[in-house]
């Protein structure tokens, strides 16, 4: 093998080895209703959202994709910023995380049998920490 062929092979091998490995994302639609108990049980307009579920190694990642109040992200991964925990059991799949600096928590749970989702997300609302509670049925794809 000449120098050019070896160099090309090494460069191509390096490109393929350094590509990030992404887990396949499972998506599911849900019809959620939200409430903010700290604001006199203020009800939010119901919304259709998409729940994205991924696993990477032993970690579970769940993300509710919707508008401002209907966006929740949690994972079992523990990092410098977050403490994560896998809540998955025979009855449900879920994760929770807590931001170390702010104490804000978020959680997503989906009941296996009924495919009902419950979630919450702490957020700052006009200088006050409030918890947005979400719940509703999901549709299996």
Regions found by a protein language model. Name each.
Residues 34-37, 63-73, 122-126:
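Short, solvent-exposed aromatic-acidic interface loops
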Residues 27-65, 91-111:
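Short, solvent-exposed loop/hinge segments that bridge or flank secondary-structure elements
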Residues 121-141:
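Edge beta-strand at a domain terminus
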Residues 8-18:
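Bacterial N-terminal signal peptides
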Residues 19-23:
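Sec/Tat signal peptide C-region and signal peptidase I cleavage site
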Residues 1-9:
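Bacterial N-terminal signal peptides that target proteins for export
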